[in-house]
Amino acid sequence: MIEEQSDNVENKDENVSMDNNISENLPIAEEQTNEDKKLPDDNNEKIDAEDLKNTITNNDARLEQLEKEHETLKSQYVRIAADFDNFRKRQSRDQDDLKIQLVSKALTAILPIVDNFERARQQLKPEGDEAQTLHRSYQGLYKQLVEVLKQQGVAPMRVVGQQFDPNLHEAVLREPSEEQNEDIIIEELQRGYHLEGKVLRHALVKVSMGPGQQISQESEEKDKVDKDIDSEGSISEEN
């Protein structure tokens, strides 16, 4: 009986010892299982790295393509903007030129009237109160015309004493001058006008030939007279 109890006690001790061993080994097994889970699969890691590398390469290529497209669109935009700006400036310039042409045509028709007023102003010498009153009346009208021309951008040329310029002047007469050098304007025969910096009407002028031209002309006339005298003398001797 005592032996059976003793055996039971020993069996219980063995069971307790086994239970303790199992309990002690259980956390270790769990840790190993967790570590096994944490350990990466070499094949999966290699595949993921290749995919990531391919993705980065594709993204870089796509980014480069988008940058090229951006530069192309930017260049097209800059070119279109420049073309539009040039078109706008050209349209504005054409409109200004057309406006000047129309105004020039109208003002050119008025200029002969202004010329007549200026000739009358220089030549007429009114006598008596009635004549002076009439003179002041049409001179007032002349001033109004001049003011209208001024408001439209018309400005008279100042030519006497200036160098002759065929772009501005038209030489009607040329004559020798002891006072002015050659190609200097000595008289204005008809006034010229500018419109917005452009020639509205050329000035009709008399231009100096210079003092040397007069001496040369006198020498030619003297030589001609001498030749005539010599010719007459030869005829007399023959007779």
Curated annotation (Swiss-Prot):
Gene3D superfamilies, sorted: 3.90.20.20, Head domain of nucleotide exchange factor GrpE
Keyword field: Chaperone, Cytoplasm, Stress response
UniProt feature, compositional bias: Basic and acidic residues: 34-53, 219-230
Region (Disordered): 1-53, 210-239
Function text: Participates actively in the response to hyperosmotic and heat shock by preventing the aggregation of stress-denatured proteins, in association with DnaK and GrpE. It is the nucleotide exchange factor for DnaK and may function as a thermosensor. Unfolded proteins bind initially to DnaJ; upon interaction with the DnaJ-bound protein, DnaK hydrolyzes its bound ATP, resulting in the formation of a stable complex. GrpE releases ADP from DnaK; ATP binding to DnaK triggers the release of the substrate protein, thus completing the reaction cycle.
Assembly and oligomerization: Homodimer.
Protein name: Protein GrpE
Organism listed in the record: Prochlorococcus marinus (strain MIT 9515)
Upper taxonomic lineage: Bacteria, Bacillati, Cyanobacteriota, Cyanophyceae, Synechococcales
